[in-house]
Amino acid sequence: MTLIKSISGIRGTIGGPAGDTLNPLDIVKFTSAYATFIRRSGASKSNTIVVGRDARISGEMVKNVVCGTLMGMGYDVLNIGLATTPTTELAVTISGAAGGIIITASHNPRQWNALKLLNEKGEFLTKDNGNEVLGIAEKEDFEYADVDHLGKYTEDDTFNKRHIDAVLALKLVDVEAIKNAHFKVCVDSINSVGGIILPELLDALGVEYKFLNGEANGDFAHNPEPLEKNLGGIMDELKKGGYDMGIVVDPDVDRLAFICEDGKMFGEEYTLVSVADYVLSKTPGNTVSNLSSTRALRDVTEKHGGVYTAAAVGEVNVTTKMKDVHAVIGGEGNGGVIYPESHYGRDALVGIALFLSSLAHKGCKVSELRASFPNYFIAKNRIDLTPSTDVDAILVKVKELYGQEKDVQVTDIDGVKLDFPDKWVHLRKSNTEPIIRVYSEASTMEEADALGKKLMQVVYDMQ
C-alpha cells in the first residue's frame, strides 16, 4: 500500500487499485474534503483556491482532477501553473485566496505525487485541521455545487515574477553587493520547477550560471533528494573549477543545499546555519529548528545573543514555535530556510538570496565560510520493530532510564531526545511504518554513529 494519509495531505505512487495508491478517485475524495473544510472553517471570505504544481510527469493529470473537483465544490480556481511550493504559498496571500493546494511529492522519486494543503495564510494546516480534513474524507461528508454555482477557472503565470520581486525587496538581500561580486554558480534543479524560476532569480541578481538537469520535464535525472549520495554529477562539475559554488534544490524548491567551490558538500544541515548567521548579524533575535537539526544553529544563535528553541519535527510545528518565540529566522536541518520577513514557509529562493548576500559581504570562499562554523556530524539509523511492538511504551522507558542522569536533558515533545553536554540523540517513531528513527550528532561521525548504535541496543534490550 503506497497511499499515505497525513495531516499535511495525501501522497502516494501513481497507478494501481483505488485506496492503495494515489489515483483519481482518492484525489477527488481528499480535494472534496479539503474544500469542505475550508468552507466550514469560515476563515476567509474568498471563494478562490490557488493550485500550483511541480513538474512531475503525473502533475498535469493530478492538476486537472484537483481543479475540476474544486470547481464542482463551487470554488473558483486560480491555477498558477508550474510553480514552486513557496511560490504557491505566497500566491495564496498575494491573491487573498481562501487556501491553496500544492501538487508535489517534494523529494520523493518520479512515480510519487501528493496534495499539500494550505490555509488562507498560505501555511500548512495544523494537526487539528489536518485531522478534520481526514475525518471528512473518511466519512465522505461533502456536498457538490449545483449547476448555477459551479466554480470558475482562471490561469495566472505571473507569480514567479512576483515571488522574485518579493525576494529582491527584502532588506537583507543586497542585490548590489551580489552583482558586484560577479559570482559564477552551477545549479542542479533536478528537472523540475527550479529550472524555470531560478534562472530568473539569478539573472536579477547578476549571477552567471550553468544548469544541470534544468529542463522542467519531471523525468528526474537522479534521486531528487538533495543528499551527497545523489549529487555526484554537480560535485564533479564543481571539481573542474571555474565556479564559486554549487546550488541544489529539490523538485518543489523548498529544500536547498550548497556545494563548495572545490566540489565538497557544504552540508545540508549548514544551509540554515549559514543563512541564520548572516540574518542574526544584521537583526539579532531568536531562532527555531526541529529537534533533529544540528546543534550548530544553537551555537550561532547564542554567539549573537539570541535564544535557540527546538520544535517538533514538521514545518507547521517549526513555524508555530517561531511565532511563539518571535524568531527572526528558523527552519529545518534538511535545507529548509524559513524567514518570516518573507513568509512562514521553507523557501529556497530566499535562502539563495540571503546566502549570496552573506558571501558577497564576507568576500570569502564558500569553503572558508563553512570552516567558520562549529563542526558537527549527524548519523541516521533506524530500528525495525514488529507491528505489535508498543513503540510509545519503549520511548517512555528510554525517557525514564535517562531522566535521572545529571548531565542529560530529556525532551519528549516529539519522541525522545537526549541532550548530552557535547552530543545528542533523538528517537522518533514513524507514523507509517513499525520503526523508530534514530538521529544522533557529535563532533565526529564515528562518535555520532556510536551514540546512535548505543541507543539502538538499549531499545533492543527493552523488548
Where in the sequence are the language-model features?
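Gly/Ser/Thr-enriched, mixed-charge loops and adjacent short helices
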Residues: 13, 113-238
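Short glycine-centered, acidic/aromatic-flanked micro-motifs in structured strand/loop junctions
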Residues: 52-53, 187-189, 260, 341, ...
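An N-terminal, well-structured beta->alpha segment
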Residues: 1-68, 72-73, 152-185
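Glycine-rich phosphate-binding loop
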Residues: 97-112, 238-260, 265, 308-310, ...
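Phosphate-binding and adjacent anionic-ligand microenvironments
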Residues: 283-463
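Proline/glycine-rich low-complexity loops and linkers
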Residues: 71, 131-165, 260-333, 337-338
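N-terminal small/polar loop signature for handling phosphorylated ligands or for N-terminal nucleophile
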Residues: 36, 48-112, 200-259
